[in-house]
A protein has these predicted regions:
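Long, positively charged, glycine-interspersed low-complexity recognition regions
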Residues: 210-288
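Short, structured coil segments at secondary-structure junctions
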Residues: 48, 170, 247-250
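Short helix-loop-beta connector
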Residues: 22-28, 187-188
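SAM-dependent nucleic-acid methyltransferase catalytic core
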Residues: 1-17, 71-193, 197-202
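SAM cofactor-binding core of SAM-dependent methyltransferases
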Residues: 27-103, 148
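Short, glycine/acidic-enriched loop or turn micro-motifs at the edges of active sites
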Residues: 34, 59, 181, 198, ...
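Glycine/threonine-rich flexible loop motifs
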Residues: 203-207
Length: 288
């Protein structure tokens, strides 16, 4: 099992760096900022007998997971229809297909069932640009990411992976609300992974995620740690001492990383290259 879609800020590439800090044992797993779910995949493989509580404030993203869990047959029927129409097309025709479908998703989604809407968004995410979530005035405040390379050969999505997710999600409680809503599910020996929008990235689905919200995440980490949970929070170090000054008894670990999806710096000659940055992991271990 692997993440269902590419996701800017996804944790697939960071898992090896995190390996020495992840808990060996936990009874439940809680992820308040689910996104693409790479950390959930790790947790499920680590302990499939655990219970799982997954949240994201983005209702459209959560509808994809809910549809795969509860209505995978109709989800795949809709997805397969798009795939069959899309694959025979030339690249210019695929681009036209993508933008027409994106427009339908933006303005005419009321005609679809919740599952059809979710499958449509999933298709757009699989054919859109680099796992980036954008909204703009031309898409009614809904998914507005440009098309991707559109170079799929024989399939747009991985059927077996969707079915693995269908099975795994049967063990999951899925919610879409504020990230603090997870508190009611936390128990001693829960593993909670906090992956808020990074400092310097400015937005969470078009809403400014400012330092006041970052402080709420740090408070949540401290509260959960005090309750006996294993807690980890990822973020970006922008060099102003923000996390160091609020570290308390928590551990801070630093990682040098290179961003390739949507965070490319412009060179003096006008070209673009991958942007180097420093990420942090704040770790609060329980004492039970």
């Amino acid at each position: 099992m692997k993440p269902l879609f590419m996701w800017a800020g996804g944790k697939n590439k960071m898992l090896k760096k995190y390996a020495n800090y992840l808990p060996e044992q936990f009874d439940s797993y809680i992820e308040p900022f689910l996104g693409g779910g790479a950390m959930f995949v790790w947790a499920y493989k680590k302990n499939p007998e655990a219970t799982f509580f997954l949240n994201d404030v983005n209702e459209d993203i959560m509808r994809i997971y809910q549809s795969i869990r509860n209505d995978v047959g109709n989800f795949l029927t809709t997805l397969d229809k798009y795939q069959e129409d899309f694959l025979p097309l030339s690249k210019p025709e695929r681009k036209k297909f993508y933008y027409a479908l994106r427009q339908e998703h933006a303005y005419n989604y009321q005609k679809w069932t919740a599952t059809e809407e979710a499958a449509t968004l999933y298709f757009l995410m699989k054919t859109g640009f680099n796992g980036i979530w954008q909204i703009n005035k031309n898409t009614n405040g809904r998914f507005g990411t440009p098309s991707g390379l559109l170079n799929q050969k024989d399939k747009v999505y991985d059927y077996d992976n969707v079915m693995e997710w269908h099975e795994a999600l049967q063990k999951c409680t899925l919610i879409s609300g504020d990230f603090t809503d997870c508190l009611e599910y936390a128990q001693p020996n829960s593993f909670v992974f906090l992956d808020p929008p990074y400092r310097g990235s400015f937005t969470q689905y078009g809403v400014f995620f400012d330092d006041t919200l970052q402080l709420r995440v740090i408070k949540l980490l401290n509260d959960l740690t005090s309750a006996g949970c294993h807690v980890m929070m990822s973020n970006r170090d922008v060099g102003d001492g923000f996390f160091e000054s609020r570290q308390g008894d928590n551990d801070l670990v630093y990682f040098d990383v290179t961003y390739t999806a949507g965070r490319r710096k412009k060179n003096t000659d006008g070209t673009h290259s991958a942007k180097k940055a420093r990420e942090i992991l704040m770790i609060g271990e329980h004492n039970g």
